[in-house]
Amino acid sequence: GVTLKDFAILDAKGDALKVIGAKGINMINLRTEWTGGPKSTNGAYGFYPVESEDVLIDGCVAIGASDAGIYVGQSKNIIVRNSIAQYNVAGIEIENSYYADVYDNLASHNTGGILIFDLPDLPQQGGHHIRVFDNESINNDTDNFAPEGNIVGEVPRGTGIIIMANSNVEVFNNLMSGNGTVNLSIVSYSDETDDPNYYPHPRGIQVHNNTYGPSGFDPDVGTGDLAKALFEISDGNMPDIFWDGVVPMSQMLFGQPKDEKLVMVEGEEVSFLTISPIKYMLGISSPIRTDKNEFKGVINPLEPINIEGI
């Protein structure tokens, strides 16, 4: 294993700290920053471990990345904790990864706070078993400054947490507030792909015991499709939690398997919106569903992540 600790990397021309193919990589008390503020010419990634196993990011600070401040991709057995991500496009991003715990972090003044993504056409995909808990994703209010063509260039300013196309994600005990578009979004990957192995829909998502402050007060309808569609569907009455409702056609007709269903246990005051895609496509009646009680169920907590020696 490798431990990197107690230093800073400022104004890197490219990515600040990239690690590929490590088994046991600890990044502790580090800082990556682009000091000129948010610019598309800033490096893409602050902390950037990929294709690695047993990844610890602890007590780190990431500022100003034009893609993601703290990014873990195509990796396995991951802990990101006690860290701060500010003024990045994506604050903290876990992508195409298996078994991750993301907790006790602050994501603020990014475009989007915390992203759990799975994308096609990568050697490792089918991201699963991710816990996001005890974080603050607040006041994410920086305009999207990603260079043209980046997937995170679609993320609207003012997004707290986005889950896209992952399986078995548990989101709990977080504070989401001050996010002008939406506090929590659960969405399918919507672009065309020829990848036969890719599954574009989220499944087995559990959301419970989070705290939601003001959101939806300044939706970024000019970036990507999410905010614009949500603004139109909701007549401008943006919810705390949005699920796009998109599932495979067979499940639209016959329902989802129990273990793939969205489960939500949140306070009465928390607002929710989803869409019935068939009603939406046929235009027969209002496609909107806002009763989160139909998604109430028993939470099956995911196992904590253990990294040997930590």
Segments and roles (model prediction):
Residues 2-11, 23-36, 53-66, 76-90, ...:
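Right-handed parallel beta-helix
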Residues 11-18, 39-49, 64-71, 87-94, ...:
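Extracellular beta-strand/beta-solenoid scaffold signature
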Residues 116-117, 142, 217:
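Short, function-defining helix-loop hinge/capping sites that tune catalysis or transport
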Residues 192, 197-310:
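Acidic, glycine- and Ser/Thr-rich low-complexity intrinsically disordered tracts
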Residues 182, 186-187, 203:
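Structured C-terminal portions of repeat-based eukaryotic scaffold domains
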